[in-house]
């Protein structure tokens, strides 16, 4: 979802949060969108999303961040959840090795359902619990490099690198969108220079933003 619309923002980017249940996706969402953290937050039931508007290279971007439970029983919503996403944060818990071991499965699912150009940031969350660490930062960095992903360790509790993670993803999405728009303009200019040619290339979806849907406890 990368809409260019005549509203109070220039672009609307849909970003999905994925990863096992309990890794801190909901607190990452609330930290980025509301600057809040809840120590007793429960697992998300179904799907919820929140938005935040910010500046990316002089453009006003509305980030629509989607969060869903990681349990297998919610896999039925996979296709709808990923549809239209242009960015993703793949989150694991640095204190739980199994959540890191499951990263490749989540990555495979993401690549199966999302656009091939989706921008992915892998986030090793709960970096504030370094004394309980079971996944070395180097392991996360190595896996990210192997898979061609960006990587940061984050702490929703201490607000460490949460802002940077989203800003990095949003900036990369914007660069991709800008390159596509420029290529389309160049192609249109080339076509207009050919007698008898008048091709219009539309690379922007101007449909309205999706309706808000939220169900959480």
Swiss-Prot record:
Compartment(s): Endosome membrane; Golgi apparatus, trans-Golgi network membrane
Tissue specificity annotation: Expressed in root tips.
GO CC entries: cell plate; endosome; endosome membrane; Golgi apparatus; plastid
Stretches for region Disordered: 196-217
SUPFAM superfamilies associated with the record: P-loop containing nucleoside triphosphate hydrolases (SSF52540)
Membrane association type: Lipid-anchor
GO biological process, one term: protein transport
Transmembrane domains' residue ranges: none
Main location: membrane
PROSITE patterns xrefs: RAB
Protein residues bound to GTP: 19-26, 67-71, 125-128, 155-156
Ranges spanned by the short sequence motif Effector region, renumbered to the chain: 41-49
Lipid attachment, kind S-geranylgeranyl cysteine: 214-215
Keywords noted in UniProt: Endosome, Golgi apparatus, GTP-binding, Lipoprotein, Membrane, Nucleotide-binding, Prenylation, Protein transport, Transport
InterPro entries membership: P-loop_NTPase, Rab_GTPases_membrane_traffic, Small_GTP-bd, Small_GTPase
GO molecular function: GTP binding; GTPase activity
UniProt cross-references to SMART domains, sorted A to Z: ARF, RAB, RAN, RAS, RHO
Family: Belongs to the small GTPase superfamily. Rab family.
PANTHER family linked: DRAB11-RELATED (PTHR47979)
Function: Intracellular vesicle trafficking and protein transport.
Protein name: Ras-related protein RABA2d
Organism in which the protein naturally occurs: Arabidopsis thaliana
Name of the encoding gene: RABA2D
């Amino acid at each position: 979802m990368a809409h260019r619309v005549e509203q109070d923002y220039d672009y609307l980017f849909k970003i999905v949060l994925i990863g096992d249940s309990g890794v801190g996706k909901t607190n990452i969402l609330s930290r980025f969108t509301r600057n809040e953290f809840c120590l007793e937050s429960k697992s998300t039931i179904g799907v919820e999303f929140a938005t935040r508007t910010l500046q990316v290279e002089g453009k006003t971007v509305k980030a629509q961040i989607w969060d869903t439970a990681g349990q297998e029983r919610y896999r039925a919503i996979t296709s709808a959840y990923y549809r239209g996403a242009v960015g993703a944060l793949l989150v694991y818990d640095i204190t739980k090795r199994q959540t890191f071991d499951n990263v490749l499965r989540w990555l495979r699912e993401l690549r199966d359902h999302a656009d091939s150009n989706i921008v992915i940031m892998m986030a090793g969350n709960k970096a504030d619990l370094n004394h309980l660490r079971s996944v070395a930062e180097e392991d996360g960095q190595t896996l990210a490099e192997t898979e061609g992903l960006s990587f940061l360790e984050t702490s929703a509790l201490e607000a460490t690198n949460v802002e940077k993670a989203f800003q990095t993803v949003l900036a990369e999405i914007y660069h991709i969108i800008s390159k596509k728009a420029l290529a389309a303009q160049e192609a249109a200019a080339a076509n207009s220079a050919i007698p008898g040619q008048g091709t219009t290339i539309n690379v922007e979806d101007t449909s309205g933003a999706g309706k808000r849907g939220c169900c959480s406890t």
